[in-house]
Amino acid sequence: MDLLQAAHACLQACDPVEKVALTQQYAAAFRAGSLPLPAQADAPEPICMPGRPPRPLLVHPRELPRRGLGTPEGRAAFIHAIAHIELNAIDLAWDAVYRFRGVPDGFYADWVAVADDESRHFMLL
């Protein structure tokens, strides 16, 4: 497996816990030098939407009830929203790794580090 295949696998992972585990595994392997960049790579396959679990159903935020931070439900909804932001940040970082070909190695290293950081943020929530 190479770094671009790892990025694709992370983008396709539907379970958030699996996505985080793969991210941390591949980031560690990349740092250790055991997940190489391919010398030549074909154009990336289009990814319309990163993997998501089948439930809960994604809805527009306007369709959700407004909750203030003064209630336990409101605080839970706030943390849930932040978790979504962190999960999307993981996908955005892997998308940058997967989508852009032929850029300097440091570009990939930086985005792998971002994905790894965002996975830790997700787990903190």
Task: Describe the residue ranges of each PLM region.
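Non-heme di-metal
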Residues: M1-L125
